[in-house]
Amino acid sequence: MEPLAKARSLLLGSAMILLAIGIVMIYSASAIYSFDRMGDSGYFIKRHLVYVGVGTLLAFWASSLDYKNLRKHALPILGTAIGLLVFVLIPHVGHSTGGARRWFKVLGFSFQPSEFLKIALIFYMADYLERKCSSLNDLKRTVLPALFILGISAGLVLKQPDLGTAVTISLVIFILFFAAGFDIKYLLVIITGAVPALAYLMLAKPYRRKRILAFFHPWDDPRGVGFQIIQSFLALGSGGIFGVGLGKSQQKLFYLPESHTDFIFSIIGEELGFIGASSVVVLFIVFIFAGMVIVFRARNRFSQLLGLGLISLISFEAMINIGVSIGALPTKGLSLPFISYGGSALLANTIALGLLVNISKELPQEGHPET
């Protein structure tokens, strides 16, 4: 089997297994909660299966479309995504939950435009950086406009507020700046400005300060800000090597909040043990490895940048989610790709998967023979 075909098989295989794990674990983690709140133990899994079906169709669509021809629409696509971010902030238009205004409600389903923005921004930046390759380090013509677009996008996400998504988007685009060949002096200036800005954003809001304190000292307030991460620790710790058994989690019994969304990895660790949790990590490593093989063998610079942005996005989201669950990072509120309940995120993941498959179908770049 040729290298690109192998990479494509690994990419699709790992993604399909992760999706299957997600279906099983969402039902396991949410059944009791959904019966208590909705009167139907299958409420969340039924909705998730709808998203899986739609996501599968979107993945097939993204894997077969002429994405290079779509480049001429990169700016309108990004403009639409930014417009949706503006509209979602309008009271009575965007749906507000827990003080955050991030969703549209459509026919009983929620749509989060920031998930669409992630794909749109990566697509636009890949096109922009490829078009500007001859003047890549021109401050006025290339660097500042790119930073302006990133600033507008991240700024609107911050207004929702959603710091985790804003940071993730910024990290991915920084990777693209680096890969495209931005001068090191510009990259250092960006880092120098970004670090204090991030520190300010993390400390400016009381609830974010509490999350930082809970990250360092969760046991100082075990019934308050430290409660969620402590329950995550208890879930992971009680799972041991082989787990307590599928469906037998104690932490999902109203102890661990967001057990079927942001903290589903903890339930995996509890029910399937270290073996199950490690298997999920290995599947993500396989997915990322296969994605990077596709990126390095991509036919042209645009495809390389697009693929790198997409695989970086899924990589960062997986690392951050797992990092939060094991206490290595402060609570961020990001879902685990392909596994967590969350329709908009799943649809974005499947579109990214489809585009990566699409890129893998092209002939390899010169210098990377299929031998």
Describe the residue ranges of each PLM region.
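Transmembrane-helix terminus/interface motifs of multi-pass secondary transporters
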Residues: 31-32, 259, 315
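Glycine/serine-rich anion-binding loops at beta->alpha junctions
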Residues: 107-117, 159-161, 240-245, 334-348
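Hydrophobic alpha-helical transmembrane segments and immediately flanking/interface helices
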Residues: 260-261, 265-269, 343-351
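Hydrophobic alpha-helical transmembrane segments of multi-pass inner membrane proteins, especially
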Residues: 12-20, 24-28, 37-228, 266-324, ...
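N-terminal membrane topogenic signal
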Residues: 1-16
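TM-adjacent membrane-interface loops and short helices in multi-pass inner/ER membrane proteins
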Residues: 214, 218-265, 272-276
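A juxtamembrane structural motif centered on a specific transmembrane helix
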Residues: 1, 321-371
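Short linear Ser/Thr-Pro motifs
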Residues: 28-31, 249, 340
